[in-house]
Amino acid sequence: MSTLQELQENITAHEQQLVTARQKLKDAEKAVEVDPDDVNKSTLQSRRAAVSTLETKLGELKRQLADLVAAQKLATKPVDPTGLEPDDHLKEKSSLRYGNVLDVNSIDLEEPSGQTADWKAIGAYILGFAIPIILKALYMLSTRGRQTVKDNKGTRIRFKDDSSFEEVNGIRKPKHLYVSMPTAQSTMKAEEITPGRFRTIACGLFPAQVKARNIISPVMGVIGFGFFVKDWMDRIEEFLAAECPFLPKPKVASEAFMSTNKMYFLNRQRQVNESKVQDIIDLIDHAETESATLFTEIATPHSVWVFACAPDRCPPTALYVAGVPELGAFFSILQDMRNTIMASKSVGTAEEKLKKKSAFYQSYLRRTQSMGIQLDQKIIILYMLSWGKEAVNHFHLGDDMDPELRQLAQSLIDTKVKEISNQEPLKL
């Protein structure tokens, strides 16, 4: 740790730099007022950034100085024979040792938590871009998502494409698409776009384009999404025409429609219409005037594609279509089922196997319901009864080798290992 004198010298030096930087900022502001060209504007931005950086650094140094002074005061105090810290409220020492001091200075309580994203602002921002850059960014954050997040964690990245530009004084300038790649400790602003929020809004606004380009997240690929959507219209129409176990059977054959899943969905649509939120209605209205490909009922060729890139909640543009939020919940249960199967067949202790299980459904449910709508569990049951068995049979379980071929190869491995060593052969 720096000594008291070093910190004081550092603070003095930064204060001098800050005075100079503020003077340069004033000069830059005057220059922009006189001649507002790109060079002067760029200089002004860099001057502002320099002042902001110096102010942040100076504040940090002053906090360090205060901490150091406080630590020195504590060090000079006689050690309490009970082992208690001077400001601990306990009268007797706890059985737990003292741990880390967590500095919460950087946390801003005015900022909302992740569940309260401003979808209206996020949607308006995304709709201001050309479709090619949105789809390319979606590809990078879904199909190549794991690598993109790993390479850029803790930063705010910018996507750039020739299709996205703005003209300033007749000059074309790139229009960057900003996405924040948070760490577990990051606090996100309501209008800030994270990979999860981006996948949610992009899939919700442009499902037809996602379908046309067949952009599928690996997380959805392994639960057989590609197979599931292949004959989607036949599948959903057959499902809607089927008899619903949650409706009373009609007394006369002419009223058979009254007991179908279609009728249950019509009743559900009436319930959903009563729980609409104004911000999301405004977003849908704005999207309809732009190039978005929205839909009003689940029996639409591209409706299922809002989940192709595994958004972490139901997209707001599809939230008020009966059966769609529940369809997303069905997919999240399939992800949990596949991970449970993978954990069950893996080698390891019960604790290690439990760690491999997932909670996609709980996360999806919590995030979607925080948008102001309660999921109808009966619809999820209907999906599971109709499609669950078929979906599980099309899971990709990472075991494509024929059992007989595996057994033959394993016997050859066992024989060779025993010939050259006395170690136990591993399983293929």
Swiss-Prot record:
Signal peptide boundaries: none
Annotated region described as Viral RNA-binding, given as residue ranges: 175-217
MF terms in GO: endonuclease activity; RNA binding
GO cellular component: host cell Golgi apparatus; host cell perinuclear region of cytoplasm; ribonucleoprotein complex; viral nucleocapsid
Organism: Andes orthohantavirus
Region described as Viral panhandle binding: 1-175
Region entry Interaction with host RPS19, spans: 150-175
Region listing for Chaperone activity, in residue ranges: 1-100
Renumbered residue ranges of the record's region RdRP binding: 1-50
Family per record: Belongs to the hantavirus nucleocapsid protein family.
Protein name: Nucleoprotein
Region (Homomultimerization): 1-79, 100-125, 372-420
Effect listed in the UniProt record for changing residue 104 to A: Loss of homotypic contacts
Quaternary state and interactors: Homotrimer. Homomultimer. Homomultimerizes and binds to viral genomic RNA to form the nucleocapsid. Interacts with host MAP1LC3B; this interaction participates to the protection of Gn from virus-triggered autophagy. Interacts with host SNAP29; this interaction participates to the protection of glycoprotein N from virus-triggered autophagy. Interacts (via N-terminus) with host RPS19; this interaction probably mediates the loading of the 40S ribosomal subunit on viral capped mRNA during N-mediated translation initiation. Interacts with the viral RdRp. Interacts with host SUMO1 (via N-terminus).
Site label Important for the endonuclease activity, positions: 88, 103
Keyword Phosphoprotein belongs to the record: yes
Involved in the inhibition of IFN induction: annotated segments: 252-296
Interaction with host UBE2I/UBC9: annotated segments: 188-191
Function recorded in the entry: Encapsidates the genome protecting it from nucleases. The encapsidated genomic RNA is termed the nucleocapsid (NC) and serves as template for transcription and replication. The nucleocapsid has a left-handed helical structure. As a trimer, specifically binds and acts as a chaperone to unwind the panhandle structure formed by the viral RNA (vRNA) termini. Involved in the transcription and replication initiation of vRNA by mediating primer annealing. Plays a role in cap snatching by sequestering capped RNAs in P bodies for use by the viral RdRp during transcription initiation.
UniProt-listed GO biological process terms: symbiont-mediated suppression of host innate immune response
